[in-house]
Structures are given as C-alpha cells and as structure tokens.
C-alpha cells in the first residue's frame, strides 16, 4: 500500500464514500460514521486529530508509510487518534462500525507511522 506516502491521500468521505459518511458537521468538528464488512479495504486517506468510538468489535490491518499494524478493538472503545494517513482492511469475521469525531482546528501534521494507530 505504498499510496500511503502520497501527500494527496484524500478525505475518506471522497476516497471511500461507500464506507464513510458525515453524520454531523459544524465549524469545530466533523463526525464520520464508518461501516464495512469482512475483507473490505479502504483507499489511502487522511484523518485530522480525532476521537474514535467503536460501535462493534473488529480486527483491522492498517497500512502506513512506515509499515503495517494489526489492531483488535472491542465495542465501546473510545480513543485518541492522532492526525494520520493510512489505508485499512477488515481482517476479521465481523463488520466494522466506528464513529470518528474529527477536530477541525487541528494543526498537527499527519503521521505516517504504524505507532499512530488508534490508542
């Protein structure tokens, strides 16, 4: 997934409109809902600093410029997601369902490190 190096990695609502959609947006935040099924993959995209809330238990492989990272997250996990560029794939047997609360006033430079995966 070398495309994660691209500075043009886009808005996930544009790169994967079948998986991401905006549920709330104002001048301070944008809330995205993400859903996919086992085996689904996303194109490289970027997130600003965000809070991630998992609404299902799932397994994912995240592809960053610096490598990959496998994550297992349980329903109800709430964590900080630093600004980053990545692509992902559902490596489990259950659908993924997540809310991202993206901060609009974030000035952080997106990370391309596997260590930037959800905390």
Name these PLM-found stretches.
Residues 14, 19-24, 108-109:
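Local beta-strand/beta-hairpin segments that build beta-sheet-rich folds
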Residues 65-83:
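Short acidic-glycine-tyrosine-enriched beta hairpin
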Residues 109-119:
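Extracytoplasmic/periplasmic copper-protein system
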Residues 46-61:
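Short, conserved beta-strand element in jelly-roll/cupin
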Residues 30-47, 63-65, 82:
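Conserved short histidine dyad/triad with adjacent acidic residue
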Residues 2-16:
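N-terminal low-complexity, Pro/Thr/Ser-rich intrinsically disordered segments
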Residues 57, 83-106:
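Ligand-binding loop in jelly-roll beta-barrel domains
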């Amino acid at each position: 997934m070398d495309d994660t190096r691209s500075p043009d990695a886009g808005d996930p609502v544009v790169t994967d409109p079948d998986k991401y959609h905006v549920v709330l947006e104002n001048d301070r935040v944008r809330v995205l809902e993400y859903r996919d099924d086992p085996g689904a993959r996303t194109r490289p995209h970027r997130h600003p600093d965000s809070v991630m809330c998992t609404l299902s238990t799932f397994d994912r492989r995240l592809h960053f410029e610096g490598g990959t990272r496998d994550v297992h997250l349980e329903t109800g996990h709430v964590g900080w997601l630093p600004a980053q560029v990545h692509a992902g794939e559902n490596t489990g047997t259950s659908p993924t369902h997540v809310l991202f609360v993206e901060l609009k006033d974030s000035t952080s430079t997106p990370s391309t490190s596997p260590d930037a995966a959800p905390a």
